């Protein structure tokens, strides 16, 4: 989850400085784990009874208090997510409460619940971006993957309502065995609608379901490598051959000259955080190695605890020294979700990157 996409140069510079200083400049708040769809690969969804047994959802006042504490600690960018955030009873109230605090807000949604009335209140003070997860290019794919036979039509209606009001939209798409056949149409649709799209070929195992390393609902490493290749073909078009040549040149010339040091290799836990619906703060939605509840000890203490944990975490030395790392997307979250430990190499990612290099070289 990325609360700081679509940055201007000044904002990018701020975020880079926050990384170096350990300032929590950006966060994600999961408002609830409930959803109106039932996607096969979902890592977050709970039933209402499961949620209540674990922790009831927190109120507007509780979240607005945490938002105030986070703002004082340096947070500027916030992503509101779920579950499906448009199921949260006080979303509009919380959204505008945080807007008044000066937050730059984005929202993650499946888009199926956005009607004209919802689009109207969003348009009064639009989010930086409304990120819609696009699961396919037909109602049939939505039926098979998400259990919603009208999902695609609902999303297209939402897009129409949002575009009428000049609300910035971005599509996110994660490829699975259930929607890989729609890849070309998904990309074509984003181009026709002039909506930027981020298509993911790597699917994290559902760590919350105690399914570490579970591959049932994701592509094999070889399939994911092939998908990555095709995504880049679509993205770069006529410049694809030049992109491949440049990537392979970087790979062949790469030598690790930086000394190994502890810490995560991304922004998670360095300047970005995730807060589960129950209030537990972690570096990322997929890291399970350190949780601290913001409602128990306050935001600043929770952030400092996670930040110090991240700074002292030992990621695999093998990954640090690996020549493929220049083309590999491995991170702490992939190590934890693949193996249950940050110290172990995420072999699925190794295989994926190796297959990808073979595809590009040939």
Regions found by a protein language model. Name each.
Residues 2-18, 23, 260-263, 280-281, ...:
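Flexible mid-to-C-terminal extensions adjoining Fe-S/redox cofactors in radical SAM and related proteins
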Residues 1-129, 227:
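Conserved alpha-helical substructure of the radical SAM core
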Residues 30-38, 269, 319-326:
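Cysteine-centered iron-sulfur cluster-binding motifs in ferredoxin-type domains/subunits
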Residues 124, 133-135, 140-268, 274-282, ...:
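Radical SAM enzyme [4Fe-4S]-AdoMet core and its adjacent flexible, acidic
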Residues 58, 89, 150, 178-181, ...:
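Residue-level signal for the nucleotide or nucleotide-sugar donor/cofactor binding architecture
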Residues 38, 74, 126, 167-168, ...:
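Short loop/turn motifs at secondary-structure junctions
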Residues 48-57, 144-150, 214, 337:
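Short glycine-enriched, charge-decorated loop/helix-capping segments at active-site entrances
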């Amino acid at each position: 989850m990325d609360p700081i996409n679509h940055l201007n140069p000044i904002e990018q510079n701020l975020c880079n400085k926050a990384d170096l200083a350990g300032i929590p400049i950006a966060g994600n708040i999961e408002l609830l784990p409930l959803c109106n769809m039932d996607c096969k690969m979902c890592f977050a969804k709970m039933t209402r009874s499961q949620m209540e047994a674990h922790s009831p959802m927190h109120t507007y006042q509780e979240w607005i208090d945490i938002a105030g504490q986070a703002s004082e600690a340096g947070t500027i960018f916030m992503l509101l997510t779920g579950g499906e955030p448009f199921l949260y009873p006080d979303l509009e109230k919380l959204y505008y409460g945080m807007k008044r605090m000066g937050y730059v807000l984005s929202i993650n949604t499946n888009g199926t619940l956005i009607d004209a009335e919802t689009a109207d209140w969003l348009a009064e003070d639009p989010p930086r971006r409304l990120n819609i997860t696009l699961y396919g290019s037909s109602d049939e794919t939505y039926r098979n993957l998400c259990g919603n036979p009208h999902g695609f039509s609902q999303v297209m209606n939402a897009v129409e309502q949002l575009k009428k009001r000049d609300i910035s939209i971005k599509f996110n798409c994660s490829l699975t065995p259930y929607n890989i056949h729609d890849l070309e149409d998904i990309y074509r649709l984003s181009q026709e609608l002039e909506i930027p799209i981020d298509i993911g070929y790597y699917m994290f195992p559902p760590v919350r379901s105690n399914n570490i390393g579970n591959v049932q609902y994701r592509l094999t490493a070889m399939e994911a490598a092939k998908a990555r290749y095709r995504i880049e073909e679509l993205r770069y078009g006529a410049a694809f051959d030049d992109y491949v040549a440049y990537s392979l040149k970087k790979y062949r010339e790469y030598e690790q000259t930086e000394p190994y040091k502890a810490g995560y290799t991304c922004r998670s836990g360095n300047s970005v955080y995730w807060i589960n619906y129950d209030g537990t703060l972690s570096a990322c939605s997929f890291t399970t190695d350190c949780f601290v509840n913001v409602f128990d000890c306050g935001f600043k203490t929770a952030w400092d605890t996670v930040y110090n944990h991240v700074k002292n975490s030992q990621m695999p030395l093998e990954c640090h020294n690996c020549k493929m790392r220049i083309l590999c997307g491995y991170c702490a979250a992939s190590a934890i979700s693949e193996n249950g430990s940050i110290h172990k190499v995420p072999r699925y990612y190794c295989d994926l990157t190796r297959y990808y290099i073979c595809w590009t070289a040939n």
